[in-house]
C-alpha cells in the first residue's frame, strides 16, 4: 500500500458521499437544525442596530413595551437555537456512528476476499489500525463536516446580503479580506493533512511492532532479546514523537495566521467604519452591526479552523480506509460464473504449477494426479 502519496480530497469525498445515502433524511434534518442555530447570531446585530439608531434619532419612540417585545423575540430565537443544537449534538453523532459502522463492515468484508499475498505484504498492525482507530474520527467528521461548512456558508451569505443593504462599499472592503485568509489557511491545511497521514502510518507501524513482539514473547525471552526489542520500539516511538512535533508546528502557524487576519479585519472595521460614519455614509448603529457581523464571521472562521484538525483526521481515516477498498482481489469469479452444484468429491490436478509472489521458483511444479471421493492423498516435498 502506498501511503506516501495522498489521494486527492475530491476523490476521497466522492468515495465517502455514498455512505450518506441511507441516512439522507437524517442529514437533511440535521442541516435544517444547523440553519436554525444561526438565527440568534444573525438577528442580534440587527436588533442592536435598530435600538442604537432609534435611541440616537428618536429616543421617545423607544418605549419599554417595544424593548420587552424585542427581548421576548430574541428569547424565542435562543430557545429554538438550543433545541436545534440538542438535535445536532445527539442525532448527528448517532448518524456518524452508523456511517463508521457501515464502513468498518465493508472493510472487513473486503478483507475476507483478499488473497494470501496481500496479508504476506501487509502488516497486521496496519490493517488493525485502518479498520479500528482510523475510522473513529469518521464519526465526528461525517456530521461535523457538513454542519460546519453549511453554517459558515450560510452566515457568510446572509451577513453579506444584510451588510450590503447598509453600505455596499464598506461591505466589499471587509469581505475582500476573506479570500486572502482562505488561500493562506489552505496552504497550511494541506501541510497539516500530510503530517496527519504520516502520523497514522507510524501508528500502524508501532501497532505491528507491538503485535510481533507480544506474539513472539516466548522466543524473545528465550534468546534474551528484550533489550533489542525495547530499542526497536523506542526508535519507532521517538519517530512518532518527531512527526507529532512537526504536525503541531504547522498547526501553530495555521492558528497564528488566522489570528493575524482577525486583527486586520477589526482594524479595517474600526478605521474604515469610523471614516464612513464621519462622512455620514453610515449611522452609529450601523457601525455596531458591522462590528458584530464581523465578530460572527470571525467566530465562524475560528470554528472552521478548530475543526480543521478533526477534518484532516477524518480525511486521513477515509484515505486509509479507501486504500484497503482499492486493493483488487487476485482471485475473482468470472462474469456469469455459476455456483458449484452436484459435487461428487473427485479432485483432479492436471499439470498444475504454483509459486508464491516474488519467489524465485515453483513450490509445486507440473503436478498431475486424481483423488477419488473418500481417498486421502498427501503431497510430500522432496528435499
What are these regions (language model features)?
Residues 32, 36, 40, 44, ...:
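Hydrophobic alpha-helical transmembrane segments of ABC transporter permease domains
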Residues 46, 50, 54, 90, ...:
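Transmembrane alpha-helix boundary and packing residues in multipass membrane permease domains
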Residues 32-33, 77-96, 147-154, 175-199, ...:
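Alpha-helical transmembrane segments of multi-pass membrane proteins
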Residues 333-334, 340-383:
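ABC-type nucleotide-binding domain
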Residues 57-59, 63, 69-72, 162-176, ...:
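Helix-loop-helix
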Residues 1-21, 50, 90-136, 205-211, ...:
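Extended non-transmembrane interhelical loops and adjacent amphipathic helices
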Residues 24-25, 113-117, 133-142, 146, ...:
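An intracellular "coupling" helix at the cytosolic face of ABC transporter transmembrane type-1 domains
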Residues 27-87, 164-169, 280-284:
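Transmembrane helix-loop-helix hairpins at lipid-water interfaces of multipass membrane proteins
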Amino acid at each position: 500500500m502506498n501511503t506516501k502519496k495522498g489521494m486527492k480530497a475530491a476523490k476521497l469525498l466522492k468515495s465517502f458521499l455514498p455512505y450518506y445515502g441511507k441516512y439522507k433524511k437524517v442529514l437533511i434534518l440535521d442541516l435544517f437544525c444547523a440553519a436554525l442555530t444561526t438565527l440568534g447570531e444573525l438577528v442580534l446585530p440587527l436588533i442592536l442596530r435598530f435600538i442604537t439608531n432609534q435611541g440616537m434619532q428618536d429616543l421617545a419612540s423607544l418605549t419599554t413595551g417595544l424593548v420587552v417585545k424585542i427581548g421576548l423575540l430574541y428569547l424565542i430565537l435562543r430557545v429554538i437555537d438550543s433545541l436545534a443544537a440538542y438535535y445536532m449534538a445527539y442525532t448527528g453523532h448517532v448518524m456518524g456512528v452508523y456511517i463508521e459502522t457501515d464502513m468498518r463492515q465493508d472493510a472487513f468484508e473486503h478483507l475476507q476476499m483478499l488473497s494470501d499475498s496481500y496479508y504476506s505484504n501487509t502488516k497486521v498492525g496496519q490493517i488493525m489500525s485502518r479498520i479500528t482507530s482510523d475510522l473513529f474520527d469518521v464519526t465526528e467528521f461525517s456530521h461535523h463536516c457538513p454542519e460546519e461548512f453549511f453554517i459558515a456558508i450560510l452566515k457568510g451569505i446572509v451577513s453579506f446580503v444584510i451588510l450590503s443593504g447598509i453600505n455596499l462599499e464598506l461591505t466589499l472592503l471587509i469581505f475582500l479580506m476573506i479570500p486572502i485568509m482562505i488561500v493562506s489557511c489552505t496552504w497550511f491545511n494541506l501541510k497539516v493533512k500530510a503530517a496527519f497521514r504520516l502520523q497514522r502510518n507510524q501508528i500502524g507501524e508501532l501497532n505491528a511492532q507491538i503485535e510481533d513482539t507480544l506474539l513472539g514473547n516466548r522466543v524473545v525471552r528465550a534468546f534474551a532479546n528484550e533489550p533489542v526489542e525495547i530499542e526497536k520500539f523506542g526508535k519507532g516511538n521517538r519517530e512518532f514523537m518527531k512527526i507529532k512535533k512537526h504536525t503541531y508546528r504547522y498547526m501553530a502557524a495555521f492558528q497564528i495566521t488566522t489570528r493575524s487576519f482577525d486583527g486586520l479585519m477589526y482594524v479595517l472595521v474600526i478605521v474604515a467604519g469610523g471614516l464612513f460614519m464621519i462622512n455620514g455614509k453610515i449611522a452609529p448603529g450601523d457601525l455596531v452591526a458591522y462590528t458584530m457581523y464581523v465578530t460572527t464571521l470571525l467566530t465562524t472562521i475560528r470554528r472552521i479552523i478548530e475543526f480543521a484538525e478533526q477534518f484532516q483526521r477524518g480525511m486521513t481515516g477515509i484515505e486509509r480506509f479507501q486504500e484497503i477498498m482499492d486493493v483488487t482481489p487476485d482471485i475473482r469469479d468470472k462474469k456469469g460464473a455459476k455456483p458449484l452444484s452436484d459435487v461428487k468429491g473427485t479432485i483432479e490436478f492436471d499439470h498444475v504449477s504454483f509459486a508464491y509472489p516474488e519467489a524465485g521458483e515453483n513450490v509445486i511444479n507440473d503436478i498431475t494426479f486424481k483423488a477419488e471421493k473418500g481417498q486421502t492423498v498427501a503431497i510430500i516435498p522432496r528435499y
